[in-house]
Amino acid sequence: MKQTVYIASPESQQIHVWNLNHEGALTLTQVVDVPGQVQPMVVSPDKRYLYVGVRPEFRVLAYRIAPDDGALTFAAESALPGSPTHISTDHQGQFVFVGSYNAGNVSVTRLEDGLPVGVVDVVEGLDGCHSANISPDNRTLWVPALKQDRICLFTVSDDGHLVAQDPAEVTTIEGAGPRHMVFHPNEQYAYCVNELNSSVDVWELKDPHGNIECVQTLDMMPENFSDTRWAADIHITPDGRHLYACDRTASLITVFSVSEDGSVLSKEGFQPTETQPRGFNVDHSGKYLIAAGQKSHLISVYEIVGEQGLLHEKGRYAVGQGPMWVVVNAH
């Protein structure tokens, strides 16, 4: 398995393309100059395209991915109704979902042969919309509205329209600020990192009709932490055994172990990392974690070690200015 790591650096308007080898070392293979401040990125389900959100001219760009080395070639673009904060796709590669924090909306862009062709739906009134996350069964779009302490739930119709479910939302505790999400590979649980109180919620997905329950909330910070809480990103290993979340004020990654059924998280430790880690990701082998420092302008690669999933630093690499997003593609 070959793996390519993409790092988005909006301040220098670049995507750095790296080869990740089996020992966890990175080799720079390409630097792409992007027409705008590049922030969120996602790889298409068929691994043929990288979709990128840019500003100040709000657009989604599609780059064709070379199958041999992961190099990028610009292919298409499509306008967006707000500044892109988060970007994702459905599992069949029919639609791109874009959450916009500043605009307070989530939009759906239709794809034809992998290329974005236009917005087909926009839902407004999502104050502080920070991500859009399709459920493993491709039925439900989970959309955290950070400033409203709620996660809105939509069914995605065959033509890409978003239909509010019943119930239409789940709520966090007041002041939590739900932000980013991941799903357990067993498709029974979701995990949401809350930005404003630096906690992680575990949501049990009981059935497709919206019977959803928060079964655990866990503080992700050290006991003696008294500064402003400012959590950012969350990821889970492919085997579902280890979960990670980062806080930008403390510049740390919290390590969680996950119970076998996915219902219970346990804090295992804390990894100091790059300054102001806004984005990180886990590779497809589940052996490595790559974190980007928005203020250090560096990325660090960590090996995921042992039963606890603790992190061991393997190397640091200079990237562009203000790196914010990390995506790993296997090909």
Swiss-Prot record:
The domain of life is Bacteria
Residues recorded with modification N6-acetyllysine:
K287
Q: What is one GO cellular-component annotation here?
A: cytosol
* InterPro entries per the UniProt record, alphabetical: 6-phosphogluconolactonase_YbhE (IPR022528), Cycloisomerase_2 (IPR050282), Lactonase_7-beta_prop (IPR019405), N2O_reductase_N (IPR011045), WD40/YVTN_repeat-like_dom_sf (IPR015943)
Q: Name one Pfam family in it.
A: Lactonase
One GO biological-process annotation of the entry reads:
pentose-phosphate shunt, oxidative branch
The pathway this protein participates in, as annotated, is: Carbohydrate degradation; pentose phosphate pathway; D-ribulose 5-phosphate from D-glucose 6-phosphate (oxidative stage): step 2/3
**Keywords (A to Z) from UniProt:** Acetylation, Carbohydrate metabolism, Glucose metabolism, Hydrolase
Q: Name one GO molecular function term.
A: 6-phosphogluconolactonase activity
Reactions listed under catalytic activity: 6-phospho-D-glucono-1,5-lactone + H2O = 6-phospho-D-gluconate + H(+)
Q: What is its EC number?
A: 3.1.1.31
User: Which principal EC class is assigned to this enzyme?
Assistant: hydrolase
Q: Which SUPFAM superfamilies match?
A: Nitrous oxide reductase, N-terminal domain
This chain's function reads: Catalyzes the hydrolysis of 6-phosphogluconolactone to 6-phosphogluconate.
Q: Which family does it belong to?
A: Belongs to the cycloisomerase 2 family.
For this entry, the protein name equals 6-phosphogluconolactonase
